[in-house]
Amino acid sequence: MSKRGRGGSSGAKFRISLGLPVGAVINCADNTGAKNLYIISVKGIKGRLNRLPSAGVGDMVMATVKKGKPELRKKVHPAVVIRQRKSYRRKDGVFLYFEDNAGVIVNNKGEMKGSAITGPVAKECADLWPRIASNAGSIA
């Protein structure tokens, strides 16, 4: 898969359960000053009539900051989902889920705006986004 289509990511993405529809509020797990992120769209979703676009681990979304620093609020930021509460199946057959939904703010190339991530990052996300993997404290 070409780097151009995935916005600075590497490798192929496997299908996982999508647990975050448009309108979901997720935690912001980096040190940019944002507390939460409100998902307004999902990158790469074509969609079907009346179906809400949904995101899963490793997906890039467009989000706004609802709580956090005033300079981050009232703007649209690209973000990547790093954890989701909805269980998803890995290729080895194990089902995995996290205790919260979380994302990190990135730029259009997939480089993080912050410099640290709180909590674990899903392996699926770390494989797709090398800049996020390098800032992750732990990869689960």
From Swiss-Prot:
Assign the protein's first listed, main location to one coarse class.
cytoplasm
Give the keywords, sorted: Cytoplasm, Ribonucleoprotein, Ribosomal protein
Q: Which Gene3D superfamilies match?
A: Ribosomal protein L14
Identify one Gene Ontology CC term for this UniProt entry: cytosolic large ribosomal subunit
Q: Which InterPro entries match?
A: Ribosomal_uL14, Ribosomal_uL14_CS, Ribosomal_uL14_sf
Q: What's any GO biological process attached to this entry?
A: translation
Q: Which GO terms describe its molecular function?
A: large ribosomal subunit rRNA binding; structural constituent of ribosome
- SMART domains referenced in this protein's UniProt entry, alphabetically: Ribosomal_L14
Q: Where in the cell is it found?
A: Cytoplasm
A Pfam family per the record? Ribosomal_L14
Family indicated by similarity: Belongs to the universal ribosomal protein uL14 family.
Q: How does it assemble?
A: Component of the large ribosomal subunit.
Q: Which PANTHER family match?
A: 50S/60S RIBOSOMAL PROTEIN L14/L23, LARGE RIBOSOMAL SUBUNIT PROTEIN UL14
In UniProt terms, what function does this protein have?
Component of the large ribosomal subunit. The ribosome is a large ribonucleoprotein complex responsible for the synthesis of proteins in the cell.
- Protein name (database record): Large ribosomal subunit protein uL14
Organism equals Danio rerio
